[in-house]
Every structure is written in C-alpha cells, then in structure tokens.
C-alpha cells in the first residue's frame, strides 16, 4: 500500500529528526502517483533517472516576457506559465517514467492572485502539476506561520526542511516543522534529498512574517544528516535542495560539513546556472526563476550503481509548449 509504506518511511525519518509526533501536515504528504518507484532493474541495463527542478516561480501562472542576452543584444521571449510547465512535465514523464520533480521554494508570493486568496488559488494548480517534493522558500512565510503550514499542508507531495523549527519562546527550540529529508528508492538506488532554506529570513524580511519559527544555519546539522542518509539509510546519492541563494550555496558546498553531498539544487537568487559549479565537496546549480527554466539533473544507473551525472538548464519556451488543459 503506497500510503502505508510512505507513512512508515516518514515515521522513521521523524525519529531521526527527534520528532516525537507527526502532525496532520506531515501525514497528509504523499509522493506523486505518477512517479516511478520501481526498485527492480535488469542486469546490465542502463537506466536514466531525471530529476527536474523549478524554483522561485513566484505565482507567475501565465507566460511572460523573459530577458535574454544573445549576440550582444537584449532579446525578449515568452517563457514559463504553469500550463506550459505541465505540458513539459507530462512529456518528460512519458519519455522517461523514472522522472522526479521538485520545487525549491517561493511558490506562494508574487502576484495579485496570490494576495487576494492568501495563496490558496495556487494549491490546486501545484497539485495538478504533480510535483514529488517541495522545499519552503524565504517567501513561504509571507502570510504568517499558520498560513504557511496550511498552504504547504494542502499540497499532495512531501515537504522537507532541516533548519526550520517551532519557536517555543525565550530562545527555546521545538521540533522541526517539516521532515529533514526524503528518499527516492528507484532502479536499485536510493537518492536522498535533504532540505535547507535561508536562515536569514527574519533579518532580510519583516520578522513578523516568520514569527513562531526558529531558523538555524545549514552547517549546524548538515554533516549529521549526510551521515544519516549515507550510513543509516544507505543512500547512493545525496542531494541538498536549498533556498539559500547562490553565494550561500557555494559557501556551503566548500565546507567540510558538505562532504558526502553530490549536488546542491539551489534557489532564491534567480540565477541561471547553465554549467554546474564544481566546489570542493559538491556541485551547485540554480535554474533561474518565474518558471522560465527547468533544471534537469540526469543520473545514469547500471546494475544498481550510479555511473554518471549530467545537468542541463532547459528553457520553458511558451511557443514550443502547448498549454495543458
């Protein structure tokens, strides 16, 4: 049973995180039914796992004019749009069932539609897209902690973040608000996703937005959770999904605490990283913003082992993608 196995998994993760009880927001989280979780593989057959990432879409429901610099000239093209992204995702899944889709934050702030509905209008849209995993960004707190929990709790897929805690007052730290990690078990390999959002949220934005939440630096528990994923969960590949901004993500990838991490799929600063930035311990990428791009990390798997990884920044060109109905 899909639900039973998933609840067992998040229960184990909660024990690791020191979470004594599961809230409804966690129990309601289920991976997309469209995602292939087939753990079997044929001997000597080559499989490709495609991990697709969006970030910082900021409620841009429709295609918009995106600026490109080409041949020393400014060029504008219509890109993005959730209906176009839905078409892209469906084509990707049809082409390769071993596709896993994530969004790394800032999905409920940035448009009049979101403001007038306190973000609620975006929930059915995101659920229709069939994401497999979410990370809260710095703007998920725009309507306050309770609304953040309600909005993210209404999304079908799991949410992870290892550095957002309930603030019990007087500097006392409570439990993690979200699970710290999620594992995709497919084709004989286990991919661990560990989430971190920007701990500077109470400084860079009004502290009233994030009242009731304590943030910690990623490096505080990163090594611990990498060890949990590698040693306890026996993950073959560890990905940090982050909403820290490119400079913080590069900084993190060069810290000893990041040893054992393969990739940081980042967000926040809207950077178009076309070639992975190789740091001391991990590669760092970021797929732009506003739904104009999708980051595609492809992992090659043979006999239950990951033999190669490649990355591409894909433009969501509206003219090439018919709007999904």
Per-range role (PLM):
Residues 323-325:
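Hard-cation-handling environments
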Residues 7-18, 22-318:
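Acidic, metal/ion-coordinating pockets
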Residues 1-5:
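Secretory targeting signals
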């Amino acid at each position: 049973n899909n639900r039973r196995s998933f609840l067992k998994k998040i229960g184990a993760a909660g024990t690791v995180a020191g979470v004594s009880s599961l809230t409804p927001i966690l129990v309601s989280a289920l991976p997309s039914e469209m995602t292939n979780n087939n753990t079997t593989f044929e001997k000597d057959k080559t499989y490709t796992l495609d991990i697709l990432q969006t970030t910082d879409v900021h409620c841009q429901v429709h295609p918009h004019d995106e600026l490109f610099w080409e041949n020393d000239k400014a060029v504008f093209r219509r890109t993005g749009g959730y209906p176009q992204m839905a078409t892209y995702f469906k084509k990707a899944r049809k082409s390769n069932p071993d596709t896993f889709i994530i969004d790394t934050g800032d999905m409920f702030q940035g448009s009049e539609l979101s403001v007038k509905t306190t973000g609620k209008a975006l929930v059915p849209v995101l659920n229709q897209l069939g994401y497999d995993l979410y990370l809260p960004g710095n703007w998920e707190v725009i309507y306050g902690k309770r609304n953040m929990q309600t909005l993210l709790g209404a999304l079908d897929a799991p949410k992870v973040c290892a550095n957002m805690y309930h603030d019990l007052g007087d500097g006392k730290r409570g439990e993690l608000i979200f699970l710290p990690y999620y594992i995709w078990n497919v084709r004989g390999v286990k991919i661990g996703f560990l989430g971190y959002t920007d701990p500077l949220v109470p400084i860079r934005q009004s502290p009233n937005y994030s009242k009731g939440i304590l943030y910690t630096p990623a490096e505080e528990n990163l090594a611990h959770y990498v060890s949990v994923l590698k040693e306890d969960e026996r993950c073959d590949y560890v990905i940090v999904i982050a909403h820290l901004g490119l400079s913080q993500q590069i900084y993190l990838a060069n810290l000893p605490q990041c040893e054992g991490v393969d990739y940081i799929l980042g967000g926040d600063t809207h950077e178009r990283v076309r070639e992975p930035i190789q740091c001391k311990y991990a590669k760092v990428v970021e797929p732009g913003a506003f739904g104009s791009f999708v980051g595609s990390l492809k992992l090659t798997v043979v006999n239950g082992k990951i033999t190669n990884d490649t990355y591409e920044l894909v433009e969501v060109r509206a003219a090439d993608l018919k709007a999904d109905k």
